[in-house]
Design a protein with these regions (language model features):
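Short, acidic/polar
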Residues: 20-35, 126-133, 253-266, 324-332
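The substrate-binding groove and active-site-proximal loops of carbohydrate-active enzymes
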Residues: 11-23, 44-63, 108-127, 149-156, ...
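Short, well-ordered coil/turn segments that N-cap beta-strands
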Residues: 7-12, 37-39, 71-77, 139-144, ...
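Polysaccharide-binding and catalytic clefts of secreted carbohydrate-active enzymes
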Residues: 104-272, 276-290
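Aromatic-lined substrate-binding rim segments of carbohydrate-active enzymes
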Residues: 27-107, 131-134, 234-244
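Carbohydrate-binding surfaces of carbohydrate-active enzymes
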Residues: 198, 202, 247, 256, ...
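Conserved, mostly hydrophobic/aromatic
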Residues: 14, 33, 41, 70, ...
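An acidic-aromatic substrate-binding cleft motif
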Residues: 1-40
Length: 412
């Protein structure tokens, strides 16, 4: 839950990317979204390249227009820091920012989740952008939450990470002798005499398959280290925002049973837990329920936010199945029944092009409010409005619990 005196109702809305569209479409959005009961939009998730054209210059003019546009319609804002995908110029000039895959392949610019979490370049510019956003919008009263990054993930195996891994190990074990003892390095002659001899465990070193390590002790510590590295990115951006907005409510969107990150540890640094629910077609309802319960349990005594779900089709599943009439409503209420008091979607208007152009939205490529999906979203929005202020912040005390631990998961 966004514990804020600015929030007194169930928040309903989702990701909005008007920079992909022209003025005519934006004006229609500002009619259709409020009519659907939308009272919050997430802005600026992937705008880093638009906001920062080079090392020293920033351009917030288009974001300013969007903020004003949704504010005029009475909507609240979840403001993202845009650091989920670095700009092309940054990768070109500072290749240390590029992530290395498990195979040892060094990435070039492209896609997203392509930043090394231990790159000095990434840290410098990401924290600077977070600070500039906080400074610019600190007095924007309808910003009720700040969204760091997006769906953190993507383990890196580059030289930046190897160097940082050695420092992390020194802090954990204190001496190389202690590390040798804990890692049982007498096995297969792995005794280390210098920290610089330690390398990242991947297909080039200790693995013969993705989940099959010949030295599980090394791999387990590397998982811990990478989770901590990405968490530090989150913490550092959060700190820049809090310097300017001490009472900011800060989160990032988690992904259920996502193995790469220790969400139990992450949740301690999040003001409220939010997550993205994208079940596969035919996924058992009990598994979806368990994911909701996992998210609810990360911060005991608090509801969580459903940050993303799809109104109908997910573009990236093996089978792009339409949700049946009423299914989106059912899944939204399932989330609420398990502790959500924020129901949000990806996204408000369907992408103009590229890989998510077939991912559904409130407003489809037809561009009108006369579609089944829009009408279902509108009906749900009206229902949520009728619930008033009774549900946000409410709790149900569980009589049973399931223990789930990422370290055990990694070790299996």
């Amino acid at each position: 839950m966004i514990c804020s005196d600015k929030v007194h109702e169930i928040l309903y809305g989702g990701d909005y990317n008007p920079e992909q569209w022209g003025e005519e479409e934006r004006q229609k959005d500002m009619q259709y979204l409020p009519e659907a009961g939308v009272n919050i939009v997430t802005l600026n998730v992937f705008n880093w390249g638009m906001l920062q054209p080079d090392e020293e210059h920033y351009d917030f003019s288009e974001l300013d227009e969007t903020v004003q546009m949704v504010t005029d319609k009475g909507m609240k804002i979840c403001m993202a820091t845009a650091t989920a995908a670095h700009p092309a110029w940054m990768a070109h000039r500072y290749p240390d920012i590029l992530r290395t895959e498990f195979s040892g392949m060094k990435r070039k610019y492209g896609a997203r989740h392509n930043s090394c979490p231990n790159s000095d370049t990434f840290h410098k510019y990401a924290t600077r952008l977070a600070a500039k956003l906080a400074e610019r919008y600190q007095n924007q009263d309808n910003i009720v939450a700040w969204h760091i990054g997006n769906e953190y993930g993507g383990i890196c195996y580059c030289e930046n990470c190897e160097k940082a891994f050695r420092i992390w190990l020194q802090k954990k074990y204190g001496s190389i002798e202690k590390l040798n003892q804990v890692w049982n390095t007498h096995f297969w002659g792995h005794t280390f005499y210098d920290w610089d001899e330690i390398v990242a465990p991947n297909l080039l070193t200790e693995h013969f398959e993705n989940n099959r390590s010949m030295y599980p002790c090394i791999t387990l510590d590397y998982y811990r280290f990478q989770s901590d590295s990405m968490l530090q990115n989150f913490i550092d951006e959060s700190a820049e925002i809090r310097k300017i907005i001490p009472d900011a409510k800060i989160t990032t969107n988690l992904m259920g049973f996502y193995k790469e990150l220790d969400y139990g540890k992450w949740a301690k640094y999040m003001d409220f837990v939010s997550w993205d629910n994208y079940p596969n077609a035919g996924e058992p309802e009990a598994m979806i329920a368990m994911k909701h319960d996992l998210m609810r349990g990360l911060k005991p005594g608090m509801p969580f936010s459903l940050m993303e779900q799809t109104p109908s089709v997910s573009n990236w599943h093996n089978y792009a199945t339409l949700k049946r009439p009423g299914e989106m409503r059912l899944m939204s209420y399932q989330a609420m029944a398990h502790g959500a008091d924020t129901i949000m979607f990806f996204q408000m208007r369907q992408c103009k092009a590229e890989c998510e152009k077939l991912h559904s939205a409130f407003i489809s490529h037809v561009g009108t409010n006369n579609t089944r999906i829009y009408k279902e979203c509108q009906a749900l929005g009206k229902e949520l409005q009728s619930l008033g202020s009774e549900i946000p912040g409410s709790l149900v005390h569980a009589k049973a619990a399931i223990l789930f631990d990422w370290n055990n998961w990694w070790a299996i």
